A protein has these predicted regions:
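Short beta-strand elements
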Residues: 790-799
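Fungal secretory targeting signals
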Residues: 1-22
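Glycoside hydrolase catalytic-domain context in secreted enzymes
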Residues: 21-766, 779-784, 788
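A glycine-anchored, Pro-Gly-centered beta-turn/N-cap motif
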Residues: 771, 776-778
C-alpha cells in the first residue's frame, strides 16, 4: 500500500493497516491474517424498513423516489463515488460522496468528519471539544447543544451527514481513538450518544453512530482482529449504546473494521439483520467505515446497505468500477444472485433520512475546500464559540485540591508560571500537531512508547486540543493556556512567566520565582496511533521538578485518556490537579474560567485512572503481527470500574470522580416502583420492536428514586449525583452498574430535590437462554453517589 500525503496518513485519514511502534512505520500485509473473503452465514433475510416510530411518511417518500430509479441508479445510491484524493473531485471536498441523479433532481449526498467540527479541510468552522470532554460534563443539555452547534455548521457547508458520534467503548485504555467516544461505560455512552444525535439531527444533518461493533479503540491490526464477545456482554455492554442511538432516531449506523466472533462486522448478519434491523427496529441505513468492506454479496445479504468510499484503498486512481459494490452489485442483481428487493430496500433506507430531515428542500450547496483561500461559506458563529468554551470548562475534572492559601481557585496570585510544550502554541502552527520539523516521518516519533522510557522528542508540540486522525478538525483559532492566562492575570497585575521547553534546569529556575506553578502535560493518540499510559516529553519529570521547587504546583493534564500519575500525584507540593481532557479551540479561556473560579468545576471522569497499568482488565494492546489475531473479551460485563471492583483493585481515581469548589450533602432517599407500569415487572416478556430502539415496554418507568441535595458552600455549584444499581444474583452481574445521573445546579446554601427514573430495561439482565430481557427476582440495591466508589445513600427494593 503506498504512503499517502503525511497529513492524511497520520492525522486525517482512515488508515486500515498501519502499525506504529517506537517511531517505526510498518505496513502490514493483510494476507498475514484473514483470508480475503470469509463467507458469513445469515439467519434471515434483511428486513425492509417499516416506517415505525414516526418514520412512516419519510419511508413512503423514499419508496416513491426509489421506485423511479433504474437498477444502476439504485446501486449508485448504495456505492460511494470516491475518496477525496480522487483528482476528479476538486480541492478536496467531502470524505464520502453519493453521485447526483439529475433526471430525478437528486443532487447527491456529502459525508464528512468529524464530531469535533468540520474536518479534513480549512473550512472556517469551530473546533469543538472532543467527545470524551463532552461526556465528562455529564450534562445532557450541554451535550445536545454541542451536537446542534456542530451540525449547524455542517449544514451551512452543505454536508448531509456528520460521521459521528462514536459509540465504541474505551475498553482498552491505550486505544488510539478512545478520545472520539464518550468513555468506558455503556450507560453513559448511550446517554451522551442519544443527546448528541438529537443535537445533530435537530440541525437537519444526519448523524452516524459508529463503529458497530467490537471496536475498542485500539488501532493496531484493527481491520484483521476478531473481537470475541459472549452473548450477555454483547447485549448488556456493547449493543446498549447503539440501542439508545436507534431510539434517538439515528439516520445511519456505521460498521466497524474488526471481525466480531470471527465474522466481519460489515457482513455480520446477526448484528445487522437480527439485532439492529429486527430487534431494535432500526429504520435508517448501515454503512461501512471507509475501506472497511471485505465482500460484496455476503455483505449485501447480511444487511449492509452502503459501501464507503466505494473504491478499494489500493486504487490510487480511485477507479470507482473497482468496488465490491458498484458494477459488481449491479451484475449480482441482474444475474439473480442478489434479489432486487434487497437493493430496493437498501436504497430506500439511505433515502429515508434524507426526506425525514428535509434535506430535499433548499439544502445548502457543498462548500468544503482544502485551500482556505477558496472557501465560500464561513460557518463559524460567536455563539458556537461560547458553546465550545462552556463544554470545555464543564468537561474539566478537578482531580485533587487543597483549597485555602494554596490550590484552587486562584485568588490574585503574585506570580504565575507555566511549564512544558503543552502550555503554549505549536511553533509549526495550530493545525500541525505532529508534523514536527518537516513532513518526513523519519524526522519525528510517535507516542506509542511500548518500552519503559517515554518518548521525549517529536510530535506533541504545543497545547493539545484534540487527538489525531479523522476525529480531529482544523482550527480557525486556538488560544493556548499561556495566552489566556496572561489576559486574565493582567486584571490582577500578576506576573506571568513560562518555560515551554523540556529543559528541567530552566523549569527549576522559573518555578522558584512563582507563587502558583502550572505544568501543562499531555498524552496524545489518534486514528492509526495507539499509545502507552505515560505523558509526552517526560512529563512526569517536568511535574516532579516543578513541584520540588514550587510549593503550590497545579498540574494541568491534557489527555486523550487515562495516564499513570503515580510519579508525582502524592507530592506534598502538588496542591491541585486539573484533568483538562481535550478542550478544542477554546481550551485556554475555559481553563482560565476554572482556575479563577468563574466556573465552579463539575466535570467527572468517564473512565478509571489506575495506580498500576496492569490493574486494568484489558491493559494491553497488540504491538506485533499475529496470524488471525483474537481479542477475547474475558472481562465479560466487568468493564472499567466494574472490573476494578470485581478484582479488588484500588485505583487512583474511580470512574465518576470529580471535585468541586463547593461541598454537597445527600439525604432523604426514597425508592419506589412506578404505578404506571404496563405489565408486571416479574413477567419475562418476549419483546418485539414496535418503535426504534426496540419494544417500547422496555422503556416503561419501573422505579422512581428521589433524594435531597444540599450545597453547603461556599460557592454556587453543580453536583453530578450518580445512580448505581446492584441486581439480585440471578442477573449474573457481580458489581454495581451505572443506571442514572443528573447535573444539578444549586446555589450556595440551597437544597434541591432530585428525581431519577429507572426503566424496565435499566433493571433487566439479558437472558442468554430465552434471548430476552428479564427482571430478576430478589432485592435490588439502589446506590446514590458522587462517584462509582463514593456512595452517599443506599436503598433497597424487593421485586
Amino acid at each position: 500500500m503506498p504512503m499517502m500525503k503525511l497529513k492524511y496518513a497520520l492525522l486525517l485519514s482512515r488508515i486500515p493497516m498501519l502499525a506504529l511502534g517506537q517511531g517505526d512505520y510498518e505496513i502490514v500485509d493483510p494476507n498475514l491474517f484473514y483470508p480475503r473473503e470469509p463467507v458469513t452465514p445469515y439467519s434471515q433475510p434483511s428486513p425492509n424498513a417499516t416506517g415505525m416510530g414516526g418514520w412512516d411518511v419519510a419511508v413512503a417518500r423514499a419508496r416513491r423516489f426509489v421506485a423511479e430509479l433504474t437498477i444502476e441508479e439504485k446501486v449508485s445510491i448504495c456505492t460511494g463515488n470516491g475518496f477525496p484524493a480522487n483528482p476528479s473531485i476538486p480541492h478536496h471536498t467531502c470524505q464520502g460522496n453519493i453521485s447526483p441523479i439529475e433526471r430525478v433532481n437528486f443532487t447527491g449526498l456529502c459525508y464528512t468528519d468529524s464530531d469535533t467540527g468540520i474536518g479534513n479541510s480549512h473550512s472556517y468552522g469551530t473546533g469543538f471539544p472532543a467527545g470524551v470532554t463532552a461526556a465528562s460534563t455529564w450534562n445532557r443539555e450541554l451535550i445536545r447543544a454541542r451536537g446542534y452547534a456542530i451540525s449547524t455548521e455542517f449544514k451551512a457547508k452543505g454536508v448531509h451527514a456528520v460521521l459521528g458520534p462514536v459509540l465504541a467503548l474505551a475498553r482498552v485504555p491505550g486505544g488510539g481513538t478512545n478520545f472520539e467516544g464518550f468513555g468506558a461505560d455503556p450507560f453513559l455512552t448511550g446517554a451522551a450518544g442519544y443527546e448528541t444525535i438529537l443535537g445533530h439531527q435537530g440541525a437537519g444533518v444526519q448523524a452516524e453512530a459508529k463503529q458497530y461493533l467490537g471496536y475498542d479503540g485500539q488501532q493496531y491490526n484493527r481491520t484483521y482482529y476478531s473481537s470475541n464477545i459472549d452473548d450477555k456482554t454483547l447485549h448488556e455492554v456493547e449493543i446498549w449504546p447503539y440501542a439508545e442511538a436507534v431510539r434517538a432516531g439515528v439516520a445511519c449506523v456505521m460498521t466497524s473494521y474488526p471481525y466480531v466472533n470471527n465474522s466481519q462486522a460489515s457482513q455480520n448478519a446477526y448484528l445487522l439483520n437480527d439485532v439492529l434491523k429486527t430487534h431494535l427496529g432500526f429504520q435508517g441505513y448501515t454503512q461501512t467505515d471507509w475501506f472497511g468492506l471485505k465482500s460484496g454479496v455476503s455483505a449485501i445479504l447480511a444487511g449492509l446497505d452502503q459501501d464507503m468510499p466505494g473504491v478499494a484503498f489500493s486504487q490510487t486512481d480511485n477507479n470507482s468500477a473497482w468496488s465490491y459494490y458498484g458494477a459488481n452489485y449491479t451484475a449480482a442483481v441482474k444475474n439473480g444472485t442478489v434479489p432486487e428487493w434487497r437493493l430496493t430496500d437498501a436504497a430506500t433506507r439511505i433515502m429515508t433520512p434524507y426526506f425525514w430531515l428535509g434535506q430535499d428542500r433548499n439544502y445548502p450547496s457543498v462548500s468544503l475546500e482544502d485551500d482556505p483561500r477558496r472557501s465560500i461559506t464561513n460557518a463559524q458563529r460567536q455563539r458556537h464559540r461560547m458553546v465550545a468554551r462552556e463544554v470545555a470548562a464543564a468537561g474539566m475534572v478537578l482531580l485533587k485540591n487543597t483549597p485555602g492559601k494554596k490550590g484552587l481557585p486562584l485568588v490574585k496570585p503574585t506570580a504565575i508560571a507555566l511549564f512544558g510544550p503543552a502550555a503554549g502554541q505549536n511553533p509549526y502552527g495550530p493545525n500541525q500537531y505532529g508534523l514536527g520539523p518537516s513532513a518526513d516521518p523519519a524526522n519525528f516519533e510517535l507516542p506509542l512508547g511500548y518500552g519503559p522510557t517515554p518518548l521525549t522528542i517529536g510530535i506533541g508540540q504545543g497545547t493539545l486540543a484534540v487527538g489525531g486522525g479523522s476525529g480531529s478538525t482544523f482550527y480557525p483559532r486556538l488560544e493556548d493556556p499561556i495566552s489566556a492566562i496572561q489576559q486574565r492575570a493582567n486584571q490582577d497585575l500578576t506576573l506571568v512567566d513560562w518555560s515551554t521547553t523540556t529543559n528541567l534546569t530552566m523549569a527549576s529556575f522559573v518555578a522558584r520565582r512563582a507563587t502558583a506553578c502550572l505544568p501543562v502535560v499531555a498524552s496524545f493518540s489518534g486514528e492509526g496511533v495507539d499509545r502507552n499510559l505515560s505523558l509526552l516529553h517526560n512529563g512526569d519529570d517536568l511535574v516532579a521538578t516543578v513541584a520540588n521547587n514550587c510549593d503550590n504546583t497545579i498540574p494541568i493534564v491534557q489527555s486523550v485518556g487515562p495516564v499513570n500519575l503515580e510519579a508525582w500525584i502524592d507530592h506534598p507540593n502538588v496542591t491541585a490537579v486539573i484533568w483538562a481532557n481535550l478542550g478544542g479551540q477554546e481550551l485556554g479561556p475555559a481553563l482560565v474560567d476554572v482556575l479563577y473560579g468563574a466556573v465552579n468545576p463539575s466535570g467527572r471522569l468517564v473512565y478509571t485512572i489506575a495506580r498500576n497499568d496492569s490493574d486494568y482488565a484489558q491493559p494491553h494492546i497488540m504491538t506485533t503481527p499475529q496470524p488471525y489475531p483474537q481479542l477475547n473479551y474475558t472481562e465479560s460485563i466487568s468493564v472499567d470500574y466494574r472490573g476494578f471492583e470485581r478484582n479488588g483493585k484500588d485505583p487512583r481515581y474511580w470512574f465518576g470522580h470529580g471535585l468541586s469548589y463547593s461541598n454537597f450533602t445527600y439525604s432523604d432517599l426514597v425508592v419506589k416502583t412506578h404505578a404506571g407500569l404496563s405489565e408486571s415487572l416479574k413477567q419475562p416478556i418476549q419483546y418485539v420492536a414496535d418503535a426504534p430502539g426496540g419494544d417500547s415496554r422496555l422503556y416503561d418507568v419501573a422505579i422512581v428514586v428521589e433524594f435531597q441535595l444540599r450545597n453547603e458552600g461556599p460557592w454556587d455549584g453543580t453536583e453530578i449525583p450518580q445512580l448505581y444499581l446492584e441486581m439480585p444474583p440471578e442477573a449474573g452481574n457481580p458489581t454495581k452498574i451505572l443506571r442514572g445521573f443528573d447535573n444539578v445546579q444549586i446555589r450556595d446554601g440551597e437544597r434541591q430535590n432530585v428525581r431519577l427514573f429507572l426503566t424496565r430495561k435499566d433493571i433487566s439482565y439479558w437472558d442468554v437462554v430465552g434471548q430476552t430481557w428479564v427482571v430478576a427476582d430478589g432485592t435490588f440495591t439502589v446506590l446514590i453517589g458522587a462517584s462509582s466508589n463514593d456512595i452517599r445513600l443506599k436503598g433497597t427494593l424487593i421485586i
